[in-house]
């Protein structure tokens, strides 16, 4: 009987302390959304596959070209 009473008291104590900690932790996790959107221009020029092929062929490269991270590369 004595052990059951001690277990009941300890469970009640743990329940109360966990509820108190839960209320404190939810207040600190409120995140507010920023209203400003930041857009950055990519450092390298964009490349569209069909435009790259067409530009290279119009310059005289009969095999066209391909897109790389640095832009369009024409094939001989």
Swiss-Prot record:
<keyword id="KW-0929">Antimicrobial</keyword>
<feature type="signal peptide">
    <location>
        <begin position="1"/>
        <end position="19"/>
    </location>
</feature>
<protein>
    <recommendedName>
        <fullName>Gallerimycin</fullName>
    </recommendedName>
</protein>
<dbReference type="GO" id="GO:0006952">
    <property type="term" value="P:defense response"/>
</dbReference>
<keyword id="KW-0211">Defensin</keyword>
<keyword id="KW-0732">Signal</keyword>
<comment type="similarity">
    <text>Belongs to the invertebrate defensin family.</text>
</comment>
<comment type="function">
    <text>Has antifungal activity against the entomopathogenic fungus M.nisopliae, but does not display any antifungal activity against S.cerevisiae nor any antimicrobial activity against M.luteus, B.subtilis, and E.coli.</text>
</comment>
